[in-house]
Amino acid sequence: MDGQPFTYTGLSFFNAIYNPAFNKSSEERIRWLEKFQKYGINVLRVWAQWDSRRGYADTCPECTVYFTDGRLRQPHVETLKQILVDAGKQKMAVELVFFSQESWHDNIRVGPEESARAITALSKELLPYRNVMFQVWNEFDERTLDHVKTMRAADPKRLVTNSPGGAGVVYYARGQGEALDYLTPHTTRQRTGRHWEIAPKELSYLLERYGKPVVDDEPARNGTPNFGGPAEKTYPSDQMIQIYKVWRLGAYITYHHDMIQTGYGTPAVPPSGVPDPEFSPYHRAVFEFIALRDRYSR
C-alpha cells in the first residue's frame, strides 16, 4: 500500500456498505476498523451487489451500488467512498466484489451493456481511492475478461481479480489467470475432506503456475451447512491449521465465517450485523491466531 509491501489479511464483511451499525458515523466505523486491526485484519471483502433473496444480514432489493440498467445508486456509492476514506486512514484496503452469483441465480442480472456502464461509472467514481481492489465476480465466470477490459479501460492501474467458482473451483479459464493482477480462488471446504490439507495444495498449484499473489479468498468456515457450509462440527483449529499452511506457502488469507448467512435474530449473527472478532469464543480464538501472523508465518 502506498508503494510499500502489503501483507494481505482479509475478513469477509460482505454487507459493509449496507450495515447501519458500521455506517452510523465515521467515528463508529473507525472504532470497528481499529478493532479489526487489533486482530491483524487489513482488508475487508465487501460486496457491491447485496440484493440476493437468501436472507443474509442486511440484504434488500435496493442493496446494490448500481441499478440493473447500469446507473449508479449514488447514496450507496457515497457510503462506499466514506468507508474507503476511513479505511485509508487506518492503512486498510477493501476488496470490492462487483457481481454476485447468488443474485445471478436469483435472476437479478445486469446485461452486457448495462454491466459495462456500471463498471465504467463506478471505476471513474473511485479513481481517487487507491485502497480498493476490484473482484469481478463472487464464485462465477460470465464475461469475466470483458469486464476486466472495461475496468482497465476506465482505470488502468486498478488491481483486478476474480473468484471463478464455488468451493474447490481453483482453475481459471484460458487467458483469465494471466490477465488478473492476483488470484482469489475459493478453495475446498469440508464436504470434500480435510480442507486444511487440500486447500494449501490448491493454492500451491496456482502459485507455481501463474507466479503471482494468491489469496485464500473464501475458505471453509464454521456454522450453518447452508450456502456451502459444513455438514459436521468444526473447530477453530481447523481454520488455524489452514491459515498457518497458507502463510507458510507465501499466500494470503481471508477469514470467512458464519456471522452473516442466517440473518438477524439467529444465534450466529451479531446484533450489529458486523463481523465482530469477539462475538464468540470460536471466532475470537481464530482472530487471536491471525493477530500472531508475524510469529507463525516465518
Regions picked out by a protein language model, each given a short descriptive name:
Residues 117, 130-288:
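Extracellular glycoside hydrolase catalytic/binding regions
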